[in-house]
Amino acid sequence: MKKLTLCVILLFSSITVFSQTEKYPVFKDCEKTSINDLPTCFKDRLKESILSEFSIPDNIKQEEFRETINIVFAVNSNGNFKVIYVNSPYKELKEEVYRVFSTLPKIKPANYNNHPVEMQFVFPLSIPLDNNSNKEVIREKIVVEVFQPEKKKEKRPISNSLFPEHTSELNIPFTRAEYSLYDYYLNKSENSHTAVKPYVYSEVNKYVDLDAEKNKLIKPKSTWFGKKLLNEHMALVKGKDFWFTVDPGVDLQIGKDSDDVNTFNNTRAIHINGAIGEKFSFSTNFYESQGRFAKYINQYAESIKPDGGNPALIPGRGIAKEFKTDAYDYPVAEAYVSYTPNKIVNFQFGNGKNFIGDGYRSLFLSDAASPYPFFKINTNFWKIKYTNLWMWMQDVRPELTVDGAYKQKFMAIHYLSWNVSKKLNIGLFETVIWDDANDRGFDVNYLNPLIFYTAAEFSTGSRAGNTLLGLSLKYKLKDVSLYSQFILDEFRLSEFTGSDEWWGNKFGIQIGAKYHNAFNIENLYLQAEYNAIRPYTYSHDELNLNYGHNNQPLAHLWGSNFKEAIGIARFTKDRWFANAKIVFGKKGFDFKNGTDTSSYGGDVFHDNDHRASDYGNEIGQGNTAKIFIGDLQVGYIVNPATNLKLFGGITFRNFNPDVPTNEFDKTNSTWISVGLRTDVFNWNFDF
């Protein structure tokens, strides 16, 4: 195979301006060089040494890897080279970097006021470039722009200390647009796990230099106002063993839909994040919001309203009270603490959301429902990531409300992610839902982090809980990842092999693919996904044991009894972004017309004892609706530190049921909106 060469593009950008009393490290060949020419001599000798020694690993050649990796290294006060950090997902590439630097000779260290000091540098390495390209770069003297000397003494270098969260145990806010970037780098790694979200900053920072990614977007500003508006956290307080940031947040939107509804959202928020020491991090977010949405969203929000007189429940957010005469007021509070005592285990406790899966949707656990209290343990060792998740849920329907108090229920999840090989990942999922029947409260039988929940459910009474099982697969190619999920609620082999479509064969399937840098276009991301879930999946014959929370499904937003195909495209260029999405689907609803009260299997909250039929059940049965949703959004990142975005979007939705009802009317609507938003969670309006 043709030998590939590397080009080292050396850029010198000093963090501290050097005076005449400060001196670069000196190779032996540079000892007679004038002090003004020492930087150039140092870079030239280092570049020559690395290029002559470096050999690209075979697997990198085979995959035709084309990236620039940043090597953070130092020349210590004794004159020895040491590698501090390499932002490459390839283990072999990291090992080669360490090997090459170990061959470098001991040199004279940098001097400051005639004292030897450690000096740190950033060394970008582009792979691959041919010899001619390499020589051109050297001749152009781009060398003078590359090395970034740093006089920091941190255990781990941070190229911009304005973002301390990047090395913390905080969660990265789960937004699909941002996570598509992280997925790219994580999928390049041989032993990463991508299903359980949100990710922790310190874990992702092993595979992608988060500071470098954010620094690409920094605007040169000299005024305090310009820095805070466009680049930085509003307030950053740091001490020797702690730090915290305080940022205001907004979600300000105005728009109009074709049903002549003037839409708006007015959210004011406060985001506080911080850490005490290296192992303990905390976060709190409070939102005060008023809004009126497109007509179909308002109708859905009112259809799932809670008992107690409040007019609506905003999907994904929470219970809303009336605002003026035709809008909603919906406060939301989220907070958690995160503790990582060692490299293996992370503990989190708080109020928020979780997501399990590699797809746009999840058949296991999604972020479609309102926030809830949770306790989570993530354990990473060898090729395994094992997640334990316990959640406290509630049912807000009037038939389960007693003296104004909503009915409580509990949920426990095990998810085991195993990297079978460099390319194949298998995930095993199980969950159980139970309530406080017989005043048992939170059942300690489900606290065991390793037990099979089916056995535990049987030991506490077969009707005392609802257990689901799942299997996920992911296979990684060069820039493509293939993924799937299978969820099993109930199953009888004798009924499955027949053609009678028994109601109790309750399962769902997802298959999908992601394509990063599609067609060799940098930052173009494509995704295709298909989901199908049989009638009555996630439902139960006990009112409170369904797979739902606050009148919202916990898995797929559509509940069950549907087929769906999704296509997604995302593109970014500097601070600009564009997202497009189309959704085709067919779903069966209940009729809810006052005469037919049967469950057709699409509403996870409808008691399946009231099913329409034992046999002959197929996807889309009942009041069948064809659904098409097209969505386009373009925008600009105003501040990358807080993910503040200016955007405009248009959504087209065609909803065509066989029998229009007050709750599910036949609609053909277009919704146009513009806004300014701190993008830290997903709005899920594609239903």
Identify what each model region corresponds to.
Residues 5-6, 18-149:
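Charge-biased low-complexity segments
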Residues 65-67, 117-119, 264, 329, ...:
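Residue-level preference for beta-strand/loop junctions
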Residues 239, 330, 424-687:
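Exposed, low-structure sequence patches enriched in small/polar residues
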